[in-house]
């Protein structure tokens, strides 16, 4: 096992990784920007290094600086967390070349799955169903219009290198396509350095269901059941739960086997998530594969009793998976909500100083955060400031527990999306387990315009 690990990330996920490392007696090294001096991940780590100014391009994305710190601190592994450099093949390759273990899959797999077009091709070759769409890059808006007519509107125009809902737009006709193409291409180039676009037939009112997989270096691949992430705003997840209320035993078996098949097809190693859309007839379509730990990993931990960060470390250290497929538990129900520093109606960011931060306590309540009273939420990073996770024997009990916890959750000094979360869990469509990705648009009193 590793002796010292650098966490190439910030905020709650860095705190989460540090916690497991401490459990395994692994020393930890944190990195931080000038804006994160007071973040809990800096305080919890054994060592912490200032790496730059607040903008991520001047701190958390500086590969050379992070590797210099890693060498200076004498670490033998780097955990990338999620976001930032977690799915950056160049970073993973630089770690390997520096003789430092990268806690994740190989650079080649990250690169392959980082291109949605390449991922589609790989899955089709493996016999994993994909959404009908273009299998090569779109040359221009006229080709996009031609193919959209071929597949039939509405379609989703997507950036091949995209993620987090950026560079993705629902298009309903030729006029919208011509308006959307150049803007999406420009946005994708700005965010990802790659303006390659493709399109897929839009799946109307689908469920967004993903499967957690784990693969070691000894040929073993397992899935750890599914998560339902259908509650989204601007194509970004807000509420996640496991298991999915929509998935019956037959579908659970089918989607789990498909996820394992997908992982084996690309010789995957470590933890990953196979994301799918499932329509009303329970047809499954591969969407993408995330080659990292997910924000919503705690709900899987709650229903299995498995520490997923520990599994990442074990696999990266060359050990075998602790469980075979038939040994992985599935007990109870868990729901996670993301607490965002944002206006609950417009979704615009709400930076500011946290003046009060009081968390609910009790059985089946879990928190992940890196903030505290006096902490300044800045506009430099993702607005998620905390996660609230509840678990119970049944979904109904979990919803009740979540409702009580949200009533007791106190955070002052910034606006948060807690009022919106209360709307979600109190809505009869959500309570009935019938929510699709159109839930927020169709059922909540929100303005779904983009952030300025």
UniProtKB/Swiss-Prot annotation:
Cite the Pfam families for this sequence. Answer: Biotin_carb_C, Biotin_carb_N, CPSase_L_D2
What are the ATP-grasp domain coordinates in residue numbering? 120-317
Q: Which amino acids does the record list as binding hydrogencarbonate?
A: 237, 292, 295, 338
Q: Where does this protein hold Mg(2+) 1?
A: 275, 288
Output the Gene3D superfamilies linked to this UniProt entry: ATP-grasp fold, B domain (3.30.470.20)
User: Which EC class is this protein assigned?
Assistant: ligase
Tell me which residues bind Mn(2+) 1. Answer: 275, 288
What EC number is given for this enzyme? 6.3.4.14
Q: Which UniProt keywords apply?
A: ATP-binding, Biotin, Fatty acid biosynthesis, Fatty acid metabolism, Ligase, Lipid biosynthesis, Lipid metabolism, Magnesium, Manganese, Metal-binding, Nucleotide-binding
Q: What does this protein do?
A: This protein is a component of the acetyl coenzyme A carboxylase complex; first, biotin carboxylase catalyzes the carboxylation of the carrier protein and then the transcarboxylase transfers the carboxyl group to form malonyl-CoA.
This chain belongs to which protein, by name?
A: Biotin carboxylase
């Amino acid at each position: 096992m590793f002796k010292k690990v650098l966490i190439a990330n910030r905020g709650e996920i860095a705190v989460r990784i540090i916690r497991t490392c401490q459990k395994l007696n692994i020393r930890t090294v944190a990195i931080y920007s000038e804006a994160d001096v007071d973040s809990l991940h800096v305080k919890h780590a054994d060592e912490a290094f200032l790496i730059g100014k607040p903008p991520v391009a001047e701190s958390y994305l500086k590969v050379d600086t992070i590797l210099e710190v890693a060498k200076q601190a004498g670490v033998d592994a780097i955990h990338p967390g999620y976001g930032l450099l977690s799915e950056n093949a160049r970073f993973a390759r630089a770690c390997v070349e520096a003789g430092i273990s990268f806690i994740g899959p190989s650079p080649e797999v990250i690169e392959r799955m980082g291109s949605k077009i390449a991922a589609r091709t790989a899955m089709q070759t493996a016999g994993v169903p994909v959404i009908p769409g273009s299998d090569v890059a779109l040359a221009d808006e006229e080709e996009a219009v031609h193919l959209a007519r071929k597949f039939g509107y509405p379609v989703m125009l997507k950036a091949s290198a995209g993620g987090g809902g950026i560079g993705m737009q629902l298009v309903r006709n030729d006029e919208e396509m011509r308006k959307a193409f150049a803007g999406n291409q420009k946005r994708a180039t700005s965010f990802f350095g790659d303006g390659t676009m493709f399109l897929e037939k839009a799946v109307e009112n689908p469920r967004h269901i993903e499967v957690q997989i784990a693969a070691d270096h000894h040929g073993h691949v397992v899935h750890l059941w599914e998560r339902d992430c259908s509650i989204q705003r601007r194509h970004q997840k807000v509420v996640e739960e496991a298991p999915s209320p929509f998935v019956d035993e037959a579908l659970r078996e089918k989607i789990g086997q498909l996820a394992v098949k997908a992982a084996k097809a690309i010789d995957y190693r470590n933890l990953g998530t196979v994301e799918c859309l499932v329509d009303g007839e329970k047809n499954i379509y591969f969407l993408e594969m995330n080659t990292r730990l997910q924000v919503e990993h705690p709900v899987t931990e709650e229903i299995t009793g498995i520490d997923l960060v520990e599994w990442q470390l074990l696999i990266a250290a060359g050990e075998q998976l602790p469980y075979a497929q038939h040994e992985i538990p599935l007990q109870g129900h868990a729901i996670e909500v993301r607490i965002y520093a944002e206006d609950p109606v417009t979704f615009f960011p709400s930076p500011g100083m946290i003046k009060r931060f009081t968390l609910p306590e009790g059985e089946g309540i879990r928190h992940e955060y890196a903030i505290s009273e006096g902490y300044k939420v800045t506009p430099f990073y993702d607005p998620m400031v905390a996660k609230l996770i509840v678990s119970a024997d049944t979904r109904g009990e979990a919803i009740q527990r979540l409702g009580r916890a949200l009533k007791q959750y106190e955070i002052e000094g910034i606006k948060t999306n807690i009022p919106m979360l209360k709307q979600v869990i109190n809505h009869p469509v959500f309570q009935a387990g019938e929510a699709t990705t159109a839930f927020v648009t169709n059922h909540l009193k929100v303005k779904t315009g983009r952030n300025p």
